[in-house]
Amino acid sequence: MHTRAIYPGTFDPITNGHADLIERAAKLFKHVIIGIAANPSKQPRFTLEERVELVNRVTAHLDNVEVVGFSGLLVDFAKEQRASVLVRGLRAVSDFEYEFQLANMNRRLSPDLESVFLTPAEENSFISSTLVKEVALHGGDVSQFVHPEVASALAAKLKLAKA
């Protein structure tokens, strides 16, 4: 088990679904890099630095997990990090088509980079960052969907936005 894997995403914010997949990946691979994409086209609520910090807090108990922000092509980031595997999550069949296209594009751009798909635990299969932000925006309790530190950060971020 000498494989370096990257689990890429925007993580705006990191959810229990993401954390579940990170835990699973950490058991499968020697070293897991959580690649947090700058991704300005998604207009993230949290800055890249804030997202890196939140993911670091949520994954602090995992010795073989490293959190790194990046911009640019994922395949270039994977090469820089000497990773041979991309970990992707599949919540539902609806995720598969996009992930399949992405995996094929990544394979075309970097033939030695393998994509591995993991599914979250059933209780996390419906959670997305978008839904969590939507619930929080309307005053709902997101504590069952995110780590307590993420819930606090999200509440503070929304309070600032309303001020």
From Swiss-Prot:
It is found in: Cytoplasm. Its EC number is 2.7.7.3. Its main location: cytoplasm. Pfam families: CTP_transf_like. Substrate binds at T10, K42, L74, R88. One of its GO terms (cellular component) is cytoplasm. Reversibly transfers an adenylyl group from ATP to 4'-phosphopantetheine, yielding dephospho-CoA (dPCoA) and pyrophosphate. Belongs to the bacterial CoaD family. NCBIfam families: coaD_prev_kdtB (TIGR01510), cyt_tran_rel (TIGR00125). Homohexamer. This is Phosphopantetheine adenylyltransferase. The lineage of its organism: Bacteria, Pseudomonadati, Pseudomonadota, Gammaproteobacteria, Alteromonadales.
